């Protein structure tokens, strides 16, 4: 896992458009980022690596079990719906119970956004892999089917062959997205372009590892 200096959890609100100072209209995704709480600190001495454990999204008391309540009690916070880790260089820069807000990033920063893509269910070759369809007339019985699965010689299908199957619902990372605007009062971060996932789904924002 790559070591990052910071990171924040958020929720996808939706997409809109904003004008830049130059008058250009650009598409942006609105992310409700934070507030997140530092629940646990991990060090090389105790866990073998340096990281902070961050919680986001309040969970109703009756939906949390005793281990969950006990884990967050050390940080004096309520049970969290989402808990994720960020590997950091300096663990001592963070305190248990510390609040991480949208001010962690500023306009102009490059970020990587991680989310779970929308699930499409069982999909065929054309939708899932972008395959070309077959002839649609003159007696053809091959329209949207898979086609050849391989040669007669091996008499088997090799691993990695594009086939119909379940599509979407996977962890996707979109790199080098620009932060257009930050509204700390509303815990909002506007990111240029689209990000993976449905509305209200969990997103992870961290500094871009391939920033230009």
Curated annotation (Swiss-Prot):
GO molecular function: rRNA binding; structural constituent of ribosome
Pfam families to which the protein is assigned, alphabetical: Ribosomal_L3
Cellular compartments per GO CC: cytosolic large ribosomal subunit
GO process annotations (BP): translation
Biased composition (Basic residues): 128-146
Keyword Transferase: no
Region annotation Disordered: where it falls in the sequence: 128-164
Keyword Thylakoid included in the entry's annotation: no
InterPro entries referenced in this protein's UniProt entry, alphabetically: Ribosomal_uL3, Ribosomal_uL3_bac/org-type, Ribosomal_uL3_CS, Transl_B-barrel_sf
Alphabetical UniProt keywords: Ribonucleoprotein, Ribosomal protein, RNA-binding, rRNA-binding
Taxonomy, superkingdom: Bacteria
Region forming the signal peptide: none
Job description of the protein: One of the primary rRNA binding proteins, it binds directly near the 3'-end of the 23S rRNA, where it nucleates assembly of the 50S subunit.
Quaternary structure and interacting proteins, as annotated: Part of the 50S ribosomal subunit. Forms a cluster with proteins L14 and L19.
HAMAP family, per database record: Ribosomal_uL3_B
The family this protein is said to belong to: Belongs to the universal ribosomal protein uL3 family.
Record protein name field: Large ribosomal subunit protein uL3
Organism: Desulfitobacterium hafniense (strain Y51)
Name of the coding gene: rplC
């Amino acid at each position: 896992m790559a070591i990052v200096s910071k990171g924040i959890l958020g929720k996808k609100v939706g997409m809109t458009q904003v004008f830049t100072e130059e008058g250009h209209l650009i598409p942006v995704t609105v992310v409700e980022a934070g507030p997140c709480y530092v629940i646990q600190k991990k060090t090389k001495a105790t866990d073998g690596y340096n990281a902070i454990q961050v919680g986001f999204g309040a969970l109703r008391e009756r939906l949390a079990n005793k281990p969950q309540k006990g884990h967050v009690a050390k940080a004096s916070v309520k049970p969290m719906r989402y808990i994720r880790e960020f590997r950091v260089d300096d663990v001592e820069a963070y305190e248990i119970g510390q609040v991480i807000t949208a001010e962690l990033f500023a306009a102009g920063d490059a970020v990587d956004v991680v989310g779970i893509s929308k699930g499409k269910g069982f999909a065929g070759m054309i939708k899932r892999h972008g395959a070309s369809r077959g002839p649609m007339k003159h007696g053809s019985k091959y329209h949207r089917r898979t086609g050849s699965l391989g040669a007669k010689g091996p008499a088997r299908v090799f691993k990695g062959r594009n086939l119909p199957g379940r599509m979407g619902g996977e962890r996707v990372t979109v790199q080098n997205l620009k932060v257009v605007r930050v509204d700390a009062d509303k815990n909002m971060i506007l990111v240029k372009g689209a990000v993976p996932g449905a509305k209200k789904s969990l997103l992870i924002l961290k500094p871009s590892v391939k920033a230009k």
